[in-house]
Structures are given as structure tokens and as C-alpha cells.
Amino acid sequence: MKFIKRCFLAALALALVSSCELTELDLQDNPNRVSPENANVDDLYNAIQLNVQDLIEDAWYATGSMARMVANINSYNYSNAFTPEALNDLWNEAYAQIFPDVDALVALAEPRGQDIHAGTAKILRAYVMMILVDMFGDVPNSEALQGTDIISPAADPGSVVYADAIALLDEAIAQLSGTDAVAPSYDNFYGGDAAKWVTLAKTLKLRAYVTTRLVDSNAPSEVAALLAEGDLIDEASEDFQFNYGSNRLVPDSRHPLYDNHYEAGDGDYVGNYFMWLLRAEKLDANGNPVVDPRVRYYFYRQVESSVDGSINDYSCHFSNFPTQEDQPAHYADIDPRLPYCVAASDGYWGRDHLNAEGIPPDGNLRSRYGLYPAAGQFDDNSFQTTQRLGTTGGGGAGIEPLMLSSFVDFLRAEAALTMGTGEDARALLESGIRKSMAKVISFGDLVPNTFAREVDIRGEIATVEELYKPTDKDIDDYVALVISNYDATDDQLDVVMKAYLIALWGNGIEAYNMYRRTGKPNNMAPALEPNNEDFVSTFFLPAEHVNLNQNVTQKAHTVRVFWAEGGPDVY
């Protein structure tokens, strides 16, 4: 169904953001815009929310792989890591669906006083506008959506699009504040609660100003004003997340990452570096690895050992087997403990960054997306294959974590360290970790039978919950270690951003932004091959846009987004 829809969207997009032989057609209206007289506001509203979810899904592999959450296996170098065709769908979701539908909805809703519909749709539009800039740099905005009046819209500078998005957020805040308008019949994000949408809009402004802090001298004062007002996402009930269902067919309402790993296909490789961050990166005072309490929720291991496979099970590149002694020298230059070929020996089976070796028959060996956020399986040491036609775990009834209260704490901690806001970065670091832990652990409610299952451990019977659910002490000990690391280093931003990256699991966009903005973590795993080309600072413009718009030429992947100019060099 999504394929069919996207084929239709691609055709619609041609007249919207592209140049083609249509000038002789006497079309007075934008052919992509739904006319108000033929539109139902609740139907449009639902379509906008679903298409925002689709856009985020389309961004996952690109952004998540650059943040090392998933392994990019397309190439050994950055210039070929993505083709211009790779993000056509995302572009069409924005320009052929979300933006025209928002315009149509606003035109229909505002004369009727449906301010919650209109204001919240504007917030989603502003959010998508910023994402497009984050991923591509300069994009059409002021000349877009003009139909045949402007069939080859020029790009606006990213800074201008960001400013327009912030202005749209302010417009939405004013429209929603104190309104008693009727709520949408269905709102996946906030159930029609206008106050929570206002909180989101202000939080997205915080996101914008922290993101642009390297280039905007006004950002510190804007952040200070938002902090003083105090209306930011700071508790789980305000989390900005898309909520999935568990329906498998017609329509499939499950989390896309559940479909990726729990049907019949092999799916993505989880990034070795990211799994290692949770499984083995941190050490206690005796040099022993400290395991992150979230690890069993984030990943499901299909095998007990990731180093006992046959030669045909691996594609390590520099060796036949995943022996740490064969770790390439440029890994050791960054961190001698960086994992090579697998994340850890006890079943954490992923793939290294930019490893384009062939794909071995390892579908039943790879580590899987776990219970959080995709509602897959909790890792209960059962070591079973997950390719069971979507019948296991939480059934895909997970979330798309877009802007959680934990994320906001980390953004505020970053702002405290880099913008002098006066807030306590150390306290915000701890708060962010604890909120993330609570959110993740709550997903155990999706699999009560798993946690109630009894296990015989050396003659002793215990439940999975008793054996593997993190205790308060587990959480306290982990938090204490991170805080100790924070206190012991001169690079406190590195500790905060590493904790932020871990909490961001499932959100590649914010992780990609954070890495380009801060250059953290300092020990980010490099590309598998040494002397790699420059990082993907922004993605290639989508092929459909470039090929069909006379005002566009393809750009290099090394062109930085405006807010990263003068920022750290990343690899």
C-alpha cells in the first residue's frame, strides 16, 4: 500500500518542486493542493500526522547510520553511501503531501474556528521544515507550492527556512493559547490537548536555538527566555511521540522497525558501536565493563555467542573471524577498545560502519531491534530467531520517539555547558538518564508473559522479571558511574552527549544533528576503511528534485548545513 501511495506521490511531486513540460497547460490552481470544498478537515489532519510519521521513517536509515545506530553497508566511502534516489520518498512526503495538506487544512479550518486543527498542523509543518534543512541544507520554501506559477522553485537559505519555521511556531502558539476550539476527532500525538501542543512548539523552538547556537548570536538569549517561561517538555505525559498499533494486515499499523526484524526478512544490521556503548564501553574502578540497564530492551540477541560462528557467517573485511586482535589500526587511534566485526562476544552481532562486504547467511544470527522503541522482543536469554511472521514480542505497538522529556534535559545540559544558561548541567544529565530509563523500562508492560516466564537457573526457579528487569540499585549504580565520569573529566560535554546519544535510540535525526553540532562522542567509531572521504555533512538532494527542477544542481555531500558552519570536523 505504501509503495502504491508513493508512486502516486512521485507523480504529484513533479509539478510541485520540479520543472517539466507542463507550461502549456492552463492550470490556475496547484494540482497538488486539495481544494477546501472537497476536503474533510479531520481526514486531512489524520493524513498529515500519518505522513509526518512516514517522513520520519524514511529518514531513519540515512540519519541513523550516520549516527552509528544502524550499520551503513552501501559503500566503503561516504561519497557512495547514499544515492540521490535514496531520499526521493522523504522529499515527496514533505512537498507532495504534508505541506499541501497543511495549507488545505488551514484554509478549511480557520474560517470555521477550528484553531486546534490549524495550529497543530502548523507546528508539524514547522517541524518538517527544520528536518528538511537539517538533512539537505538549502531547500525550497518561499517559492514552493505555487503550482504552475512557479514550477521550478529556487531554494531558500537554510537559515531563512529555520527562521520561517520559528515564526510559524510562534503563530501556532498564539493560535492555540487559551483556545476553546473543538479538538480533532483523532490526534495520535496529544489527543487534541492544545496546551501540550503549545509546550511542544516552545520545545521545538528550544531545539532550533540549541541547534543554531554556533551561528546565531541571539540563540543564548532566546534559550534563556524559553527556560524562564518554563513551558517545555519535562515529563513523560508531554512526550512528542508517534504511537503505533499491533495490527499486522490492512493496514499494518506496527512500528516499521518491528516489520524490519520480525517478519521474514533479514532486515538492518544494528551498528556495532552503538551496541558496544551500552554493553561494554563503560568500565568500573576495576576495569570491568558496566552494562547499561537498557541494553536488554534496546536489542534482542538471537545467539548466545557472536564469536563462535563458522567462516561463512562473517564479513569482517580485515579477517575471517571477529578477533579483536585484527582491529584496524585507525580504530585504535581513536579508542583501542572500539569493537571490530561484532559489538561484544556474548551475542551482540552487528556490523561496522561503512562495511560493504557481501551479506553472509546471518539473518538468524544478527542482533535485532528490541522491545524499545519498536515493541520487539525483550532479551530474556532465550536466544531464538525473530523471523516468525510478526508473532512475537510486543507486536510492534511501539513508538517513534520524536522529542521526549529526556531529550529535552540533554538539550538543556548542552545549552548550560555551551551557552552559559546558568542551569545545572550535571543535574540535567542525571535527570535525562533517569527519565530515559523509566521510559524504556515501562515497555515491559507490553510483554507481561515474557516477564512472568519462569526459568530454571542451576536448579533455582526465577521469573524473567526477577532475573533481568533492572532494579533501582542497577539504575542508581549506572547513574553514579556516569556522574563520576562527568566529574572526573575536563570534557563534560562528551559525557553528556554520549548519554544523549544512547537515550536517542530510535531517533536518527536528532542523533545526526547532535553529532554534527558537537562532534561528540569523542570515540565515535570511524569508517571501516582508513583514509575515508569526508563525512556526509548533508545528504544529496533527491534525484527527482534535481532532475526536474531547472533551478537546481546537485550539491556535494560535504556541504555543511548552515548551523554547522565553523563547527567541529566529524568523521
Model regions and ranges:
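Short coil/turn segments at secondary-structure boundaries
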Residues: 60-64, 299-301, 508-517
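Membrane-proximal, proline-rich intrinsically disordered regions
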Residues: 20-68, 74-77, 85, 89, ...
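Bacterial N-terminal signal peptides that target proteins for export
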Residues: 1-8
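Short, compositionally biased low-complexity segments
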Residues: 20-27, 70-78, 134-143, 459-474
